[in-house]
Amino acid sequence: MYNVRGDLNRKTPSDGNVNEIGSMYASRDTSTSSFTNPTDSSTRLLYNNASNATFSSAALAAGVGGTRASGYTHRFSIRPSSQTYNRYPNGGNSAGSDMYSTSPQNNSIVDDIENINKLEAVAFAGPTAGESDFSLSREDKEIDDFLHYPLPAKDAKKLSYFVGGEGLMQLLFLLFLAAGTGMLFIGLPILTYTGHNSLASTRVTGITNHQFRILRLLRYGSLIDPDTPESAYTFDSQDLGTLDLVFSDEFNYPGRAFYDGDDQFWLATDLHYAATTDYEYYDADTPTTANGTLRLRMDAFYNHDLNFRSGMVTTWNKLCFKGGRIEVSASLGGSPYIPGFWPGIWTIGNLVRPGYLATSDGVWPYSYNSCDAGITPNQSDPSGISYLGGQRLNQCVCKGEDHPNVGTGRGGPEIDALEGTFGSGIPYNGSIYLETMPVVSQSAQYAPFDLYMYPNYDFVTIYNQSVSAMNGWAGGVYQQALSCASQLNNSWLSGNAYQKYGFDYKPGSGPDALISWFVGDEYTWTMRQPAVGQNGNIASRPVSEEPMIVVLNFGISPTWIYFYWYELTFPQTMYVDYVRIYQDSSDSSSVLGCDPEGFPTTEYIANHPKAYLNYNATSWSEAGYVRPKNSLMDGC
């Protein structure tokens, strides 16, 4: 065992006078650190952590202390002379003494700092003189350099190394990708461009992939359904002459939905129709299409605190028409023997959104363009003939007030293609009256009202009195109704068979303005405008000049008909095969759109969202708006 604790003057067993540092570098086979007095400055340069420790010769031979402590042992290792050196000789601080002089008592004392510095320099010089184990030059190559520098600097300029086979393939792929992208976004539009697409086309031959329901049903250039047969493209009206088809919907695409934004023309109602105290809730998920028909199904289903659920769709603020013919093929819901249901196919001015009572306040069912007692609340009649609050958008509204177009009386008149019911009073075979026969009421609703609600029947025509008769109900305190009831075939209900219903009409005043209703191919009755001409202190009321929307619904209400609860069965469905609109292209009074000249609606609707989007508001003031002032009642 070698005790390395001591000073540099300690002798080894083999050499009585050998320097401790030199002995560590005596041969190439053994390399170790010098472990000397930790207070010795020369020793601290080699190993600062040397302390009291005892090491075996085997440990020393293995190189304890590491490369940095021991340095390299090779043929150029410096072996100091055999004499003993002492960095701090005795008396080194006394007068006349030389700290680097040789002490006679210690054989000779020489400063070993130079030897130590040389030793450290050689330790970092590498195993061979002139070489460095820590090469910093790229020119020095080692056997594993290819892993780190696959392209030596001297070879970087060679094209074969710069590109290579793989690089060439990548370059070709990038060029192909760039060419394909350019072809897709530049070449393809150029190759497929066919020139200007005229909007005057009458047919839509293709739309898009059927997987995209909404996009597939969009129609550009024509509002005619591609599934409408060409034989239905024109119609010869008894009063209006030859008419051209301008809109149709055959409902042939299955699974259509009618939530807001789902359909180009139709919008499902989602509310309780409180205006007529209906028992059902109109749910927007109810209307759908299947087997070529629109289906409005009523279920005894608890929904929104009501016991029934059904469907209503409208074209409100999407599709409007003024003048022409509307034709609807339908099979009404319910049993032909049990009364109770209320199917409807009707139209109303676009300024009224069905079910939104604030929009109908002071607007429905006015068709009036005069400034007199007809615009006032209750028609200024103390007899209580009318409970209406007066025409809000009347002709004499002051300039600058809230009105779609000041100077024109505006309203929301209603024309019904049918309201399904059962009724007595309808002649059967000329003499027998049946209370359980299905009939349709075809009517026009007006305000202000005639005196005693009695129109001028000289301008009313009923074509077949064996199946049609004027309705005994002429209206109430909120509307005057000119209505004719016609009996139906029992098979025209519940999807068993379909029948056509609708009307032709020409807007305006005078004997040429009229409405003619029909069932199937037969006209049932006609009302010419003078039937609601001037009467008492009320001026003439024109046939609706407002842009009209289409409404299809299937309801149940105690205000419409008496029914027997225990005999009603559910579910019941109303089916609609198609809706078609015809107009005379040469007639300036016939317009397809919601903003015909002199009767705009869309801007006014957009400016009053609190009324047109909130069905909980039941009056114009409740929606947060003020009735406009007029010269007759307020002065301007």
UniProtKB/Swiss-Prot annotation:
Record has Zinc as a keyword = no
User: Could you tell me the superkingdom of the organism this chain comes from?
Assistant: Eukaryota
Q: What does this protein do?
A: Required for synthesis of the major beta-glucans of the yeast cell wall.
Q: Where in the cell is it found?
A: Endoplasmic reticulum membrane
Homology family: Belongs to the SKN1/KRE6 family.
Task: State the name under which the record lists this protein.
Answer: Uncharacterized beta-glucan synthesis-associated protein C17G6.11c
What ranges are annotated Cytoplasmic (topological domains)?
1-170
Sequence ranges on the Lumenal membrane side: 192-636
Q: Name one GO cellular component term.
A: endoplasmic reticulum membrane
Q: Which UniProt keywords apply?
A: Cell wall biogenesis/degradation, Endoplasmic reticulum, Glycoprotein, Membrane, Signal-anchor, Transmembrane, Transmembrane helix
Q: How does it sit in the membrane?
A: Single-pass type II membrane protein
* Transmembrane intervals: 171-191
Q: Where is this region: Disordered?
A: 1-22, 81-107
What residues does the GH16 domain cover?
Answer: 218-587
InterPro entries in alphabetical order: ConA-like_dom_sf, GH16, Skn1/Kre6/Sbg1
Q: Which Gene Ontology terms cover its molecular function? A: glucosidase activity
> Which Gene Ontology BP annotations are present?
(1->6)-beta-D-glucan biosynthetic process; cell wall organization or biogenesis; fungal-type cell wall organization; sphingolipid biosynthetic process
Question: In which organism is this protein found?
Answer: Schizosaccharomyces pombe (strain 972 / ATCC 24843)
Kindly indicate whether the keyword Membrane belongs to this entry: yes
Q: Which residues are glycosylated?
A: 291, 378, 429, 464, 489, 616
